[in-house]
Each structure stands twice: as structure tokens, then as C-alpha cells.
Amino acid sequence: LYEALGLGTLPRAARARAAERVLVVSAAYGVLAPDDAVPAHRLSMGTDLPGVGPLAAHWRPHLSPLLEARAAEPGQVVLDCRSAAYAAAWRPSRATAGSVVAVRVFRERATPDGPVRTVVSHDAKRTRGELARHLLLRRRREPDSPEALAAAAAEAFAVELQPAVPGRVRHLDVVLRGEGAA
């Protein structure tokens, strides 16, 4: 995700928006700003550490107050680019779930029986990073609803916003079409 986001190559205004709006969930450090200096490390949120237990469960009580407050801000839409392991560290409450839009990535290919979609796992990080970069580079008004977010994403990607279900997170499906779609 970070490589595709290319934080260091963003224009100054987009970097400032990232510093103000983007939060990074780290298995080692909790919540970080995109430009926080941290030592190189490899630690997945799916890790079960001796004496600590599963990291997602460890971080949940620490992350929830901060992320709930962000999601509860008026006119706030949270674009959730976390993988499933990281999503387990914060599950939006029913009260804030409607302002959270989780990104899923699918590859669609043509078959004789019609289009077939498969979940993209390996390249999903890159696509999420490209989406975040696109949104940071936009010079238009920041999206203030899931529908506005989907419209902004549609400027650069084939997307489908799933219908709202009260108390549930919305899903924005990014659809990569064709065999070579990445």
C-alpha cells in the first residue's frame, strides 16, 4: 500500500492532506501518521505474541476510542484500506459504521458463461494505495458521504458501492477488469 501511495512523491498539498487525514494502523505501534519515523520491522496484526496474545485483540481497546472519535466527526467518511487481520483490531460500532467504507478488490475476467469475479488478495494492497493516492491528489472538495467517496474513486477506477445496511460498514468494491488487470 505504501509503495503505491508514494507518499514522498506527492505534491506538498497532498502530503499535508495525508498528514491531516490518513491514519496507519501498525501491529507494532498502534496508530501512526503516514510520515511518522519508525524503525524497519515485520510484525503482522495476525501474530499471537507470547505474554501478549493475538495482536488484534491487544490493540482493540487502544484503537477503538481514537478511531471511533474520527469516524464520528460530522461529515466524516473513513476509507478503510485495512486487510482482514488489521480490520479485526477495530470494528466500527453500529453508531459509526455508516461513515466507514471498507475497500475490497476484485479481478473480473470474461468467460464464455459471462464475467467471473475473484477476490484479489496479493495485489489488493497496491490497488488500495493507488486509490488513496488518487483521493489525496484530487483538488476537489473532500468526499463527505460514502456516495461522494465512490464518485471520487470512480474518476480513476471501476467501483461499485454496496448498498447501505443500518449499523454495518459499507463496502466499496474496486473491480479490475481483464486478465492482466492489476
Label the model's feature ranges.
Residues 7-182:
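Internal, well-folded beta-alpha domain core
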Residues 1-7:
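Active-site helix-to-loop segments that bind/position phosphate- or nucleotide-bearing substrates
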